[in-house]
Amino acid sequence: MVLVVAGFDPSGGAGIIQDVKVLSALGVKTHAVISALTVQNENRVFSVNFRDWEEMRKEIEVLTPPRVIKVGLSAPETVKRLREMFPDSAIVWNVVLESSSGFGFQDPEEVKKFVEYADYVILNSEEAKKLGEYNNFIVTGGHEKGNTVKVKYRDFVFEIPRVPGEFHGTGCAFSSAVSGFLAMSYPVEEAIRSAMELLKKILERSSGVVETEKLLRDWYRYDTLNTLDEILPEFLEIGHLTVPEVGQNVSYALPWAKNEFEVGKFPGRIRLKEGKAVAVSCASFKDRSHTARMAVTMMRYHPHMRCVVNVRYEREYVERAKKRGLKVFHYDRSKEPKEVQEKEGQSMVWMIEQAIAELKSPPDVIYDEGWWGKEAMIRVFGRNPKEVLEKIKLMVRE
């Protein structure tokens, strides 16, 4: 477990918010106590107010003793107080002498008095020049020029490719990552190396500020595909009743999807082979798909409706859907404007827009009875594949 004692940055790019984001991304249990209140945004610090130790102590002493303590913007004597409270905990102190905009937080001479109480002191190369050389310093070179970033600890020099750009909150993110890996029993050298690799991944996804939360998008991508692969056998089980001649797809969009390549689906579709449904491939974000484009279009109006499946048209399916309370829209392809018919993929967009305009709410089912060169089709919409599957079962089972 890691105890974070750090300042509050209202912009969320640095400080205790960033610390908790990084540690959460690592799956490390975290307790947090605010040590300083700042007035700042991503570009400038206006003021800082350090909290009284006695107030902080009352909050800290009721918590579980931590394995690692990460100290951010705090009165320097806080490090000594924490060492007295937790003699067996590793303390990682991210020294912040001044902001990138030039706001002075701490006096270097005052900081020097308390360096010995931390196991590791993380600071940038400019700050290290002001404080001198200490055996427990981990010095970052992000402020220096070059195509790589170097981090120095004792006789070790770690190097990693630089991510272009200026980012608010890199010091907090890096020191929190080091703390997290130490809490997982990494040797300090490996904690530094792993923290550098993690920060690089975060910065590659960030713009202007350290956006650790975007790592969650990687989990969403995994979860979306995993959800599709797990539920596939259930779709195959009823596939003999649902798969149309053109094949079937289960398209499940990421929450922020803007195009079909941000929608999970089954490339090659689900097909019928000797009367039995089979999937050509496992779930992927690759390949193009009409149902994927339909999912993206639906989300423009109803962002929570992220899943759509095409189903073989049977008149009794439509009647059961209506009878069992699903919201059904009949799409008449003969009424499509010429410009819609002539533009590839535009029919799907226009279809959904017409359904929403008439129903005034998200449709469960949109069906059409076919047209020249177009197979009659039912499309079923829902929040996720499980919900769509249940709607399909309502339609196909007597």
Swiss-Prot record:
CDD domains: HMPP_kinase (cd01169). It catalyses: 4-amino-5-hydroxymethyl-2-methylpyrimidine + ATP = 4-amino-2-methyl-5-(phosphooxymethyl)pyrimidine + ADP + H(+); 4-amino-2-methyl-5-(phosphooxymethyl)pyrimidine + ATP = 4-amino-2-methyl-5-(diphosphooxymethyl)pyrimidine + ADP; 2-[(2R,5Z)-2-carboxy-4-methylthiazol-5(2H)-ylidene]ethyl phosphate + 4-amino-2-methyl-5-(diphosphooxymethyl)pyrimidine + 2 H(+) = thiamine phosphate + CO2 + diphosphate; 2-(2-carboxy-4-methylthiazol-5-yl)ethyl phosphate + 4-amino-2-methyl-5-(diphosphooxymethyl)pyrimidine + 2 H(+) = thiamine phosphate + CO2 + diphosphate. GO terms for molecular function: ATP binding; hydroxymethylpyrimidine kinase activity; phosphomethylpyrimidine kinase activity; thiamine-phosphate diphosphorylase activity. GO terms for cellular component: cytosol. It comes from Thermotoga maritima (strain ATCC 43589 / DSM 3109 / JCM 10099 / NBRC 100826 / MSB8). Residues 1-216 are annotated as: Hydroxymethylpyrimidine/phosphomethylpyrimidine kinase. This is Bifunctional thiamine biosynthesis protein ThiDN. Pfam families: Phos_pyr_kin, ThiN. Residues 217-398 are annotated as: Thiamine-phosphate synthase. Catalyzes the phosphorylation of hydroxymethylpyrimidine phosphate (HMP-P) to HMP-PP, and of HMP to HMP-P. Condenses 4-methyl-5-(beta-hydroxyethyl)thiazole monophosphate (THZ-P) and 4-amino-5-hydroxymethyl pyrimidine pyrophosphate (HMP-PP) to form thiamine monophosphate (TMP). Its EC number is 2.7.1.49, 2.7.4.7, 2.5.1.3. Pathway: Cofactor biosynthesis; thiamine diphosphate biosynthesis; 4-amino-2-methyl-5-diphosphomethylpyrimidine from 5-amino-1-(5-phospho-D-ribosyl)imidazole; Cofactor biosynthesis; thiamine diphosphate biosynthesis; thiamine phosphate from 4-amino-2-methyl-5-diphosphomethylpyrimidine and 4-methyl-5-(2-phosphoethyl)-thiazole: step 1/1. SUPFAM superfamilies: AraD/HMP-PK domain-like, Ribokinase-like. Keywords: ATP-binding, Kinase, Multifunctional enzyme, Nucleotide-binding, Thiamine biosynthesis, Transferase. In the N-terminal section; belongs to the ThiD family. GO terms for biological process: thiamine biosynthetic process; thiamine diphosphate biosynthetic process. 4-amino-5-hydroxymethyl-2-methylpyrimidine binds at residue 40.
